[in-house]
Amino acid sequence: MSVSVHENRKSRASSGSINIYLFHKSSYADSVLTHLNLLRQQRLFTDVLLHAGNRTFPCHRAVLAACSRYFEAMFSGGLKESQDSEVNFDNSIHPEVLELLLDYAYSSRVIINEENAESLLEAGDMLEFQDIRDACAEFLEKNLHPTNCLGMLLLSDAHQCTKLYELSWRMCLSNFQTIRKNEDFLQLPQDMVVQLLSSEELETEDERLVYESAINWISYDLKKRYCYLPELLQTVRLALLPAIYLMENVAMEELITKQRKSKEIVEEAIRCKLKILQNDGVVTSLCARPRKTGHALFLLGGQTFMCDKLYLVDQKAKEIIPKADIPSPRKEFSACAIGCKVYITGGRGSENGVSKDVWVYDTLHEEWSKAAPMLVARFGHGSAELKHCLYVVGGHTAATGCLPASPSVSLKQVEHYDPTINKWTMVAPLREGVSNAAVVSAKLKLFAFGGTSVSHDKLPKVQCYDQCENRWTVPATCPQPWRYTAAAVLGNQIFIMGGDTEFSACSAYKFNSETYQWTKVGDVTAKRMSCHAVASGNKLYVVGGYFGIQRCKTLDCYDPTLDVWNSITTVPYSLIPTAFVSTWKHLPS
C-alpha cells in the first residue's frame, strides 16, 4: 500500500464525526514473552551469553534490561560489559538460581519453595529483580519458625527485607530459649547479639539463660570476642539473678575476674541486689530492671465508672484477682507505673471536684501512700514514665466560676514529677491543648496521639516531646482524627487501638517512633472506645472500653509476629476497667 492510497482513504473517512475502535488483546504480552522464550531456547537473535558455574545461558539484552535495573545499568552505561557479548558470574550465583531468574524474565512465572527461596532472594536482590526478592521474602515470612528465625533475621538484614526482618526479630524474642541453643546464635555479629540480649521484649523469666548465652557467645571465639564481655554483661539484668548464683557463679567466673571493667559491672550488680533484698531505697539501675516478661499487670476499675479497686492480672492462670482498695475512689484519672509502683494522678471524686492528688501503690509491699500533689488539678489527662520520672499531659481542669463538673478547655500544661525528690515542675507546654489523648513514651521521647482539642474537635496530630530540648513538635498526623484511644509500646513501635467512631473503634495501627511512619495492623476483636492497653513480653494486652451501650467484656492479646488478636479471658461483668498498667516484679531469690 502506497502513501498516497493511505492519504486518500484518510480523506474519504473524514466525515466530521469521531468513530474510534480501541483494540486490545489481553493475552498479547504473554504471547510475546512465550515467543521470546522460544527464540531464546533456539538461540535466535540472542546477543549476550551469561555464564554461571559450568553453564552458559544465551539471552536478549533488551529482555534482561527491561526486567532488571542491574542489567539495564550494565548494558546502557560505560561499563566494559556494555560492549562485551559475555557476562561471567563465575561462582557468585548458582546456575540453577540464575536459570530460575531467567525463566521468570521470559515467562513472568517462577516456582518458589523451601529449597530455593533463600538463594532466589539473594540473587534477586543482587541482580535487582525486585519482584522476585519481595516474593521470596513473602514466602519466607509465611514459613517462619523458631528453628529458622535466626537465619531469616540475618538474611533479611543483609538484603533490606523490612517486614521479614521485623517478623524474624519478634520470633527470636518470643523463642529465646530455642534460638539460644541454635548454632546460628553463636555466629551472630556482635551488634546483633547485644541488641537481642538487651531487648526489653526478650521473653525469659530466668536471667541465668541470658547470662549463659552471653558467656557462650564470647567463648565461641574468645580471642576476638573477649573485648566485648563488658558490653554483653550490661545486657544481662544481673541484679535479678538469684543471689547465690550471682555471687558464686558470676562473680567467680574466670573470664570476669580477669577483666577489670567486667569485674566492676558485676560488683555494681551485687550492690543493687543487696539493696533489693534489704528494701534499701529505690533501685533504678538497668541491671535491676525486669524485662517486660518479668512485669506484673494491674487493672484499676470498679462496679461503676467510679474506680475503687486495683486488680492483678494473672497471665498464666488467665484470672483477674482483687488486690487492694483505692483510698480515694475517682474517675477520669490517669495511672502510670514507675518501677514497682503505680501512680494515680488527678481525676474527679464522688463530688465531681477536680483533684490534684497523687496516690502511689507499692506492689511489693502492697501499701498505699500519698505523693506531692500536682501543680494543676486535672482530669481526662494522660501520663507516662520517661527516664524514671512521671509526666502528666493535657486534660481538663475546673473552669473558674462554673460548677465543679464543668470542664475547662483542653489543657496545654505538662508537668514532670521526680519521685526521688517528690517534686513536680512544669515543662514545655503542648503545641495544642488536648484531653482524652493516648500518651506513651518511646525512644526517650513522649508522644501524645490525637485527643480532644481546645475547640472540642478530634485532633488528628501526633505531638512529640524531646526532654533534652524541652520542646514539643508535631512530627506526623494520625491516620484519622482520634480520641479515646489506647496506646502501648513494643520496641520502637507504638500501637494505637480503639476510638469513638464506627471505623476507629475496631481499628489498630502501629507508629514507628524513629521514622514516624504508620502501618495498619489487624483489627481488634471488638469495637472499643476508652479501652486500655499495655505491653508485656512480646505481646500487647487490651481491656475495657465500650461502644454505644455495648461494653467490651474480654481481655485481648495481640501477637505482632502473627498479626493476630485473641481473647484471653473474660472480665467480670461487674468490673468496669478504668486503667491498665505494667509494673516491675522482683522475684524473691
From Swiss-Prot:
Recorded GO MF terms: actin binding
GO cellular component, one term: nucleoplasm
Subcellular location per the Swiss-Prot or TrEMBL entry: Nucleus matrix; Cytoplasm; Cytoplasm, Cytoskeleton
Induction: By p53/TP53.
UniProt PTM: Ubiquitinated by E3 ubiquitin ligase complex formed by CUL3 and RBX1 and probably targeted for proteasome-independent degradation. Quinone-induced oxidative stress increases its ubiquitination.
Family annotation (SMART domains): BACK, BTB, Kelch
Record keywords: Actin-binding, Cytoplasm, Cytoskeleton, Developmental protein, Kelch repeat, Nucleus, Repeat, Ubl conjugation
First and last residues of every Kelch repeat: 296-340, 341-388, 389-444, 446-492, 494-538, 539-585
Keyword Transcription regulation in record: no
Tissue specificity remark: Detected in fetal brain tissue, moderate expression in fetal heart, lung and kidney. Highly expressed in adult brain, particularly high in the hippocampus and amygdala, and spinal cord. Detectable in adult pancreas. May be down-regulated in neuroblastoma tumors.
Main localisation: nucleus
A GO BP entry: nervous system development
Segments forming domain BTB: 46-114
A Pfam family of this chain: BACK
Subunit architecture: Binds to RB1. Hypophosphorylated RB1 associates with ENC1 during neuronal differentiation, while hyperphosphorylated RB1 associates with ENC1 in undifferentiating cells. Part of a complex that contains CUL3, RBX1 and ENC1. Interacts indirectly with KEAP1.
Job description of the protein: Actin-binding protein involved in the regulation of neuronal process formation and in differentiation of neural crest cells. Down-regulates transcription factor NF2L2/NRF2 by decreasing the rate of protein synthesis and not via a ubiquitin-mediated proteasomal degradation mechanism.
Name by which UniProt lists this protein: Ectoderm-neural cortex protein 1
Species for this entry: Homo sapiens
Gene: ENC1
